[in-house]
Amino acid sequence: MTLLPTQELYSEILPGLWQGGTHDFDTLEYPKQYPIWNQEKLFDSVATLYAVAHPVGWGISERRFGFPDSALDEENLPDIHAMADWVYEEWKSGKKVLVRCQAGWNRSGLVTALALMKDGQKAKDAIDLIRARRSPHALCNADFAAYLNSICE
C-alpha cells in the first residue's frame, strides 16, 4: 500500500483494537524477511483480509480470510462475521489486535466495525469512529457501509 503523506500503516481505533493496511513489499510476490523468534511483536493477534499479504511472524496468532474490496458477496458474509467474532474475542480478552487488509480502509473497516457493533456500538457510531481514527476514506466502499447500516448486531 502506498501511504498518504500523513497516514500511518496502523491506527488504534480503541485501546487494543487496531486497523491497518499491508506495506507494498509485504506481499507474496516479494521475499519475506521474517523477524527473529524473540523480537518484540507489535500485536498479539492479527486478522488478515488481504489474500496476498505475507503471513505474520513468530508467536503471533493470525486468522486469514481474503475477500475482494468490491460488491459484498453474500457467500462471504458467514466468514466475515466469524472473523469479526474472533477479533472481538481476542480484543476483549486483553490482546492487542490488528485487523488488516490492503489499504486499511474497507475490508479491515468492515470487520472492525462489526467487532465494534458486537461491543454495543451502532453502525453509524462505529463508522464515524473508524473514519476519525483511521482515515476519512475508511469504509468508502458504499456496499460495505450500506451493509453495516442495514444490520443490527
PLM feature spans:
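A phosphate-binding catalytic loop at a beta-strand-loop-alpha-helix junction
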Residues: 94-113, 117
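The feature captures the conserved acid-bearing segment of alpha/beta-hydrolase catalytic domains
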Residues: 148-152
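Cysteine-based protein phosphatase catalytic domain of the PTP/DSP
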Residues: 3-97, 117-147
